[in-house]
């Protein structure tokens, strides 16, 4: 067993990014920074929950990761599967204890999100499109969690919609990237059932819906600061163009990475709109 595997299996960069998005969601909702204690708790609840979700996901994905992600801790033998299971439960417990310290609404949403993560990894992930929707919903809930924690919605509701839509696109394109390993496991993802080209159409559709939804805050009389979203929309459209043109593994990887980047950039754009 490698001690570094306890950090590596959580995919810390993703978790820290999720924590930042949760915190930024609270700022977008309020229009200013929350009190330091609440800000720290929001960041920790989202970060630790994401770590637990990634760990339990690797526990259930052991066989498929032997093909798609052999470098990860479980396939390469750096951590035992049972250890990973217990570790994920510990992370979830710590996250919920921290959520309880915020308010009852943050605790309830935390319970819903954590349970959903477990059920997704256990049963929902192989289901065509259902798994994509669940992951996208969890991503959309990340900035929304920050808003719930400060008991104010503001622009965070619009941000959650955009985060959900762009993540549906990203998850479908990720399935195109991982189609070889998914077929070996017997998973029934959208690209396997419909073919990569049709799946690409679905991904592109949700990318376009994201761009359309990104203009919803204009209805709320948001100031000129919201124009920061325009470059993000262009990035989303470029990612959609790439996967529409070519569904090879390398292209799908690049497209979904660009969409992942767009999520964080969208949060920053909404942040600018909220405080300007």
Curated annotation (Swiss-Prot):
InterPro entries associated with the record: DGGGP_synth, Prenyltransferase_related, UbiA_prenyltransferase, UbiA_sf
**Membrane-protein topology:** Multi-pass membrane protein
Q: Which Gene3D superfamilies match?
A: UbiA prenyltransferase
Q: Report which reactions are catalysed by this protein.
A: sn-3-O-(geranylgeranyl)glycerol 1-phosphate + (2E,6E,10E)-geranylgeranyl diphosphate = 2,3-bis-O-(geranylgeranyl)-sn-glycerol 1-phosphate + diphosphate
What are the transmembrane regions? 14-34, 40-60, 92-112, 146-166, 202-222, 224-244, 256-276
Under Enzyme Commission nomenclature, its number is 2.5.1.42
GO terms for MF: geranylgeranylglycerol-phosphate geranylgeranyltransferase activity; magnesium ion binding
Q: Which family does it belong to?
A: Belongs to the UbiA prenyltransferase family. DGGGP synthase subfamily.
This one is known as Digeranylgeranylglyceryl phosphate synthase
């Amino acid at each position: 067993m490698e001690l570094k595997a306890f950090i590596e299996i959580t995919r810390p960069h993703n978790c820290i990014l999720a924590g930042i998005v949760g915190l930024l969601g609270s700022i977008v909702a309020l229009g200013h920074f929350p009190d330091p204690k609440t800000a720290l708790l929001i960041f920790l609840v989202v970060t630790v929950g994401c770590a637990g979700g990634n760990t339990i996901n690797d526990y259930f994905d052991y066989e498929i990761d032997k093909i798609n992600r052999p470098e990860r801790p479980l396939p390469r033998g750096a951590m035992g599967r049972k250890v990973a299971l217990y570790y994920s439960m510990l992370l979830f417990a710590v996250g919920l204890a921290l959520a309880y310290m915020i308010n009852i609404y943050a605790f309830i949403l935390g319970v819903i999100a954590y349970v959903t993560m477990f059920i997704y990894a256990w049963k929902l992930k192989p289901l065509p499109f259902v798994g994509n929707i669940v992951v996208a919903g969890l991503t959309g809930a990340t900035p929304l969690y920050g808003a719930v924690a400060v008991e104010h919605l503001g622009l965070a509701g619009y941000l959650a919609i955009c985060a959900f839509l762009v993540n549906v696109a990203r998850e479908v394109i990720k399935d195109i990237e991982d189609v070889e390993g998914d077929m070996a496991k017997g998973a029934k993802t959208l690209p396997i059932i419909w073919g990569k080209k049709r799946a690409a159409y679905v991904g592109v559709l949700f990318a376009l819906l994201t761009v359309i939804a990104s203009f919803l805050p204009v209805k709320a009389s948001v100031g000129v600061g919201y124009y920061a979203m325009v470059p993000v929309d262009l990035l989303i459209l470029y990612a959609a163009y790439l996967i529409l043109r070519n569904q090879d593994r390398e292209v799908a990887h690049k497209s979904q990475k660009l969409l992942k980047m767009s999520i964080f950039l969208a949060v920053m754009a909404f942040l600018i709109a909220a405080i300007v």
